[in-house]
Amino acid sequence: MAIQHPDIQPAVNHSVQVAIAGAGPVGLMMANYLGQMGIDVLVVEKLDKLIDYPRAIGIDDEALRTMQSVGLVDDVLPHTTPWHAMRFLTPKGRCFADIQPMTDEFGWPRRNAFIQPQVDAVMLEGVSRFPNVRCLFSRELEAFSQQDDEVTLHLKTAEGQREIVKAQWLVACDGGASFVRRTLNVPFEGKTAPNQWIVVDIANDPLSTPHIYLCCDPVRPYVSAALPHAVRRFEFMVMPGETEEQLREPQNMRKLLSKVLPNPDNVELIRQRVYTHNARLAQRFRIDRVLLAGDAAHIMPVWQGQGYNSGMRDAFNLAWKLALVIQGKARDALLDTYQQERRDHAKAMIDLSVTAGNVLAPPKRWQGTLRDGVSWLLNYLPPVKRYFLEMRFKPMPQYYGGALVREGEAKHSPVGKMFIQPKVTLENGDVTLLDNAIGANFAVIGWGCNPLWGMSDEQIQQWRALGTRFIQVVPEVQIHTAQDNHDGVLRVGDTQGRLRSWFAQHNASLVVMRPDRFVAATAIPQTLGKTLNKLASVMTLTRPDADVSVEKVA
């Protein structure tokens, strides 16, 4: 697809493997991951600096695991508040739904508050670790065109200078109003909510109560959220007939804050901004050499804090696949699995967010009365209460097709789900999270067994070329048993007993884990070779001997 550009000779040229449009969180995460894989990356951003106005405030365990994968989680954690509960209140202040999960199966608290601009700054600083990654601010993407083997981008600087970029791939992380998506005429299906919300951030939190509260007041629903670094966020629905300009007037802002504070005059306003909530999904995530990610691919209301986290899932899913393709280790058909795996889950998160918004502000007043009564009764049913407390209603990502091999019934299979991340003990006695022992790699993880036993020499060579780590998990008391050591295998102790429980529950002894920590396949030692051949095929790995049939029999 060719897009014409004004006939102006470009002054500067950049030639890279991946161009990323947008220096938001998804673009910066893509840049960090690809950077550590040695990919030559250029990030182009229209603004002159990172956005610092009110944005996302919730980061989940999956997103923190993604931060961990690029070595930034320790710098991110100081800007978070772990175990951040969400409570729905009636107009009289009674809590009718409490979302307070205390599980950490992926290594991190499931719900966390955070300050997005500070975390974005951590990611921007993170790319400076890689000489192969550059970020150019004050660059407007004016046009682009696709050829058989590259994408050409035409940029304009703030001074009006023209630049041209040649890239093998373009990843569009340029937001809900994505220029790239609109230029490609990709339908952005969904709707825009009729009501807007004004967001107010206040320093030196005048309430200082923990957690986040959603008050379902039919007169004016509002949100009160405790954020890190003593910041309080209030969100108020903008009612019909009101405008942002009116609400910004001191007397009207005072009236809004008097709803939640005893002294609305004694506050330190950081900033305020009006938002419109959209629920939209791109029809396609890949268009030849262009891939859409984050808000460019899907946008959703804020009520479950999943817009940011869904973007992190996009980046984690796409980055390792793109790296394999660029490195020549897989054919570009692997990139088709990005949409296949991510689009359905993004749709599920949009639906959940819309539902949560309808709980907070039902379209009809009688629906709010019904909600309060039903929720009060359901709280007396322990299974229902646990369902909300433990956040079981959140659709966990599960892929039914794509870069995976499933054997048996999909409903009970762990394949296509994220693998757990417990603590493990290393042979030197150190205790660490599982991902830290594996790195940003594939892993073949075996309970008690040597994971190399079921593989041919050719398969070992093939999977090692991908950077695969071979892990043998043993009970912690066996970690120093010398006769169980195998060359090229990392032995770890099951510190918490969680890995033993996982393998027992799923009736498998071997797991093939992808770099994004999803289970690509399960096996036993006698079937591992056959399973790896199938996986190599569906992932379109490029080694010519990937289709050799190997299966050991005792």
Swiss-Prot record:
Family: Belongs to the PheA/TfdB FAD monooxygenase family.
Function comment: Catalyzes the insertion of one atom of molecular oxygen into position 2 of the phenyl ring of 3-(3-hydroxyphenyl)propionate (3-HPP) and hydroxycinnamic acid (3HCI).
Catalytically driven reaction(s): 3-(3-hydroxyphenyl)propanoate + NADH + O2 + H(+) = 3-(2,3-dihydroxyphenyl)propanoate + NAD(+) + H2O; (2E)-3-(3-hydroxyphenyl)prop-2-enoate + NADH + O2 + H(+) = (2E)-3-(2,3-dihydroxyphenyl)prop-2-enoate + NAD(+) + H2O
Protein name: 3-(3-hydroxy-phenyl)propionate/3-hydroxycinnamic acid hydroxylase
Domain of life of the organism encoding this protein: Bacteria
Cofactor: FAD
Gene3D superfamilies: 3.30.70.2450, FAD/NAD(P)-binding domain
GO terms of biological process kind: 3-(3-hydroxy)phenylpropionate catabolic process; 3-phenylpropionate catabolic process
The enzyme's E.C. designation: 1.14.13.127
Pathway(s) annotated for this protein in UniProt: Aromatic compound metabolism; 3-phenylpropanoate degradation
Binding site for FAD: 17-46, 285-295
SUPFAM superfamilies: FAD/NAD(P)-binding domain
